[in-house]
Amino acid sequence: METWQELKVTVKREGEELVSNLLIELGAQGVAIEDSLDYVGNVDRFGEIFPEVEQQEEIVVTAYYPDTVDVTVVEADLQARLAELTDFMDLGELKIGTTALAEEDWADNWKKYYEPARITHDLTIVPSWTDYEATAGEKIIKLDPGMAFGTGTHPTTKMSLFALEQVLRGGETVLDVGTGSGVLSIASSLLGAKEIFAYDLDDVAVRVAQENIELNPGMENIHVAAGDLLKGVEIEADVIVANILADILIHLIDDAYRLVKDEGYLIMSGIIKDKWDMVRESAESAGFFLETHMIQGEWNACVFKKTKDISGVIGG
């Protein structure tokens, strides 16, 4: 019987996407995330009661490798790559461990982490293998979280989805920068956007986004391509959304201002609290006005508007 290997990495929460992507690049056949924030809180806005779970600063990223892969080499390579990034991001005290699994354990083990999750008033994310019957008005996003880039339940993604629900009214052109799983593009389509153009520098992300989009019917209005932020893009948009690290966000703000239409919006997420002032100042220097600021735990997200009428914006 073929066996699989489980490699667990304990890392600070802000390192989730970075570590997940590195593990996939190093040959992982799937990743799963254990995060106490997914369960913390007594009652959410939909009246769902969550169990009492102590909130932790760290999460566990679990990657799965076939027994043909030498995970000691993977571990060494991962350690070396992460060591190069310690000045860029505080990943905490990294802990890495491995376990052997039988084939039948691998087939179902990682799926136990994922259940349908109501994210906003309208949007529910459902694992691709789950039969789920939507209620009236509920919009379903099918994702395959085994492909990488998480499940769409990370705080930065949740706030991005709330922001899209806030600004989209139907008929808009949306640019999704750093699309990852494609979840924000799929949500934009479900919320009525006319055309969505999704970009990612990572070829794996481009493939994963396309595969997730194909899990959802009626997504022909989403166009996925490789791209470095908004460089070379000449498409005017009503909404630009980017859920990526703050140090990268500041490099797309000028292009975003160039491309977003008057009265259009720039949504940014993935901003740890220590970087919020930097991002806000960069956006305001470019000419944007802050309309909405959201905080969940240590994460910030925001909606900026390109407008001459500042009566409805923060500080206007």
From Swiss-Prot:
Molecular function via GO: protein-lysine N-methyltransferase activity
Keywords: Cytoplasm, Methyltransferase, S-adenosyl-L-methionine, Transferase
Subcellular location: Cytoplasm
Family affiliation: Belongs to the methyltransferase superfamily. PrmA family.
EC number: 2.1.1.-
Database matches in Gene3D superfamilies: Vaccinia Virus protein VP39
Chemical reaction(s) catalysed: L-lysyl-[protein] + 3 S-adenosyl-L-methionine = N(6),N(6),N(6)-trimethyl-L-lysyl-[protein] + 3 S-adenosyl-L-homocysteine + 3 H(+)
Alphabetized SUPFAM superfamilies for the sequence: S-adenosyl-L-methionine-dependent methyltransferases
HAMAP family per UniProt: Methyltr_PrmA
Function: Methylates ribosomal protein L11.
Signal peptide range: none
Cellular component terms per the entry's GO annotation: cytoplasm
GO terms, biological process: methylation
EC primary class: transferase
Record-linked Pfam families: PrmA
Protein's UniProt name: Ribosomal protein L11 methyltransferase
Classification lineage: Bacteria, Bacillati, Bacillota, Bacilli, Lactobacillales
Binding positions for S-adenosyl-L-methionine per the UniProt entry: T157, G178, D200, N243
Gene: prmA
